[in-house]
Regions:
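Cyclophilin-like peptidyl-prolyl cis-trans isomerases
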Residues: 13-142
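Sec-dependent N-terminal signal peptides
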Residues: 4-14
């Protein structure tokens, strides 16, 4: 399968202001990804996955204190690509090496909730097993 690359030009987690730009959205915390293919707006489930959301937002804003020195003070996701694209299933990003094995230099535990992957636009952490979350995420297509 031909790999499609979509550059993440800017990822900004919007705590406020998203409702001004997108009045159709329910009140909440959103991530706004600006890509070469257009805008992707994702709702972040802060109440159900507070550690995961705090990690994602702090990486996006360049304020994560746990990152490896090379990423310190930088908006981690800016300029990264979706390195894994599976048609009719999902896109995966958040890896600075674009290989599927890179990360921010630390790992954190899983948060299990009643959230499911039952439709398009679901955002989840991508990992290599229990307790291996870092920066990689995927977004479902269907």
């Amino acid at each position: 399968m031909k790999k499609t690359t979509i550059f993440i030009l800017l990822l900004s987690a919007l705590i406020l202001g998203c409702s001004d730009q997108h009045p159709n959205l329910d009140k909440g915390l959103y991530a706004n990804l600006h890509t070469s293919k257009g805008e992707i707006i994702l709702r972040l489930e802060m109440e159900k996955t507070p550690v995961t959301v705090a990690n994602f937002v702090s990486l996006a804003e360049g304020e994560n204190k746990k990152v490896a020195e090379e990423f310190s003070g930088k908006k981690y996701y800016d300029g990264l690509i979706f390195h894994r694209v599976i048609n009719d299933f999902m896109i995966q990003g958040g890896d600075p090496t674009a290989t599927g094995s890179g990360g921010p230099g630390y790992k954190f535990g899983d948060e299990f909730t009643d959230l499911t992957h039952n439709g398009p636009g679901i955002l989840s952490m991508a990992n290599a097993g229990p307790g291996t979350n870092g920066s990689q995420f995927f977004i479902t297509h269907k």
